[in-house]
Amino acid sequence: MAVQQNKKSPSKRGMHRSHDFLVNPATAIEPNTGETHLRHHISPNGFYRGRKVLKTKADE
């Protein structure tokens, strides 16, 4: 079993945990529809970067 050699100071402990926080996912607004969607993903209406790339049931 591993045993620490020296006690980690509160400062070093905080630096070790600095990447453990949660981040909200990056979202974008589709210019045509005004909908919010994840960055680099198709919007629910089938638009990506202002262009229609996927047919939806509403189109048919």
Swiss-Prot record:
Residues 49-60 have a biased composition (Basic residues). Coiled coil: none annotated. GO terms for biological process: translation. GO terms for cellular component: large ribosomal subunit. It holds the Pfam family Ribosomal_L32p. The keyword Ribonucleoprotein applies. The keyword Ribosomal protein applies. It comes from the Bacteria. Residues 1-60 are annotated as: Disordered. Keywords: Ribonucleoprotein, Ribosomal protein. GO terms for molecular function: structural constituent of ribosome. SUPFAM superfamilies: Zn-binding ribosomal proteins. NCBIfam families: rpmF_bact. Belongs to the bacterial ribosomal protein bL32 family. This is Large ribosomal subunit protein bL32. It comes from Bordetella pertussis (strain Tohama I / ATCC BAA-589 / NCTC 13251).
